[in-house]
């Protein structure tokens, strides 16, 4: 690893336990619904499968039974150690960065990458496709809203726009692909005190108390409705005679 990759590895090693806790707390059946869709489309089952930037193996429990040889690659050794506890005997773990893995020229029937922070330019999608013999699957969160906090938050996550950039690039390159969106909803109870403490540094006291009153009224608890949307881009990578 070069210095930059080593720094990234150390960052994700330190964040691994917290990252896994966040994944475990998620109420959404994302991995199960994605697996069912891939079965429906005939992408699963498959022989060889690469889960690149696979982290702690969020998709592993749902995907591994559909795959003969499952390779989970990540730059973080600690992430891989956590993922190993979820693995069956058909899973191989690879401690390697995305760039180094692409350089190896290895081939997999299906290449899958979910919420990959290293896939930060559309051109890298093309590079990822070089690893695939049949399908390259890119999966990301594209929208996240809730009823209590989102209306007042101005900053947006730039990564939510990455999928639109990937699609624009693929269209420009005249590469075929199809997409599928997955919608999920959940609700959680938020206390008046939590809402107040969340915004106390953003708003003056009069504005804060006015909004607390408008939202909660005489109630101490309010239900916060969450809506998230994930999107899949599926890129066929089979070579045709004209490609040779």
Question: Which ranges hold each PLM region?
Answer:
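Conserved class I S-adenosyl-L-methionine
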Residues: 1-42
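Class I SAM-dependent methyltransferase SAM/SAH-binding core
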Residues: 50, 55-100
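Short conserved loop adjoining the S-adenosyl-L-methionine
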Residues: 100-106
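A conserved beta-strand element that flanks and buttresses the S-adenosyl-L-methionine
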Residues: 112
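A short, conserved alpha-helix within the catalytic core of class I
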Residues: 118-131
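Conserved beta-strand signature within the Rossmann-like core of class I S-adenosyl-L-methionine
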Residues: 133-146
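Short alpha-helix
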Residues: 158-178
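Conserved Class I S-adenosyl-L-methionine
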Residues: 178-244
């Amino acid at each position: 690893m070069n210095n930059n990759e080593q720094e990234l590895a150390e960052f994700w090693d330190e964040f691994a336990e917290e990252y896994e806790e966040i994944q475990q707390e998620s109420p959404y059946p994302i991995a199960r619904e994605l697996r069912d869709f891939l079965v429906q489309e005939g992408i699963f089952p498959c022989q060889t499968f690469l889960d690149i930037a696979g982290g702690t193996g969020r998709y592993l429990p749902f995907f591994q039974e559909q795959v003969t040889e499952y390779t989970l690659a990540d730059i973080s050794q600690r992430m891989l150690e956590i993922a190993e506890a979820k693995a069956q005997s058909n899973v191989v773990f690879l401690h390697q960065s995305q760039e180094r893995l692409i350089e190896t020229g290895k081939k997999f029937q299906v290449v899958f990458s979910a919420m990959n922070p290293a896939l930060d330019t559309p051109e890298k999608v093309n590079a990822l496709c070089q690893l695939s013999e049949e399908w390259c699957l890119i999966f990301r969160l594209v929208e996240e809203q809730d009823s209590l906090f989102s209306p007042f938050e101005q900053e947006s996550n730039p990564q939510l726009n990455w999928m639109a950039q990937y699609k624009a690039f693929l269209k420009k390159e005249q590469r075929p692909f199809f997409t599928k969106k997955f919608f999920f909803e959940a609700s959680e109870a938020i206390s008046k005190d939590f809402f107040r403490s969340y915004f106390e540094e953003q708003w003056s006291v009069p504005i804060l108390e006015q909004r607390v009153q408008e939202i909660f009224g005489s109630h101490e608890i309010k239900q916060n409705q969450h809506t998230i949307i994930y999107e899949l881009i599926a890129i066929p990578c089979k070579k045709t005679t004209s490609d040779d």
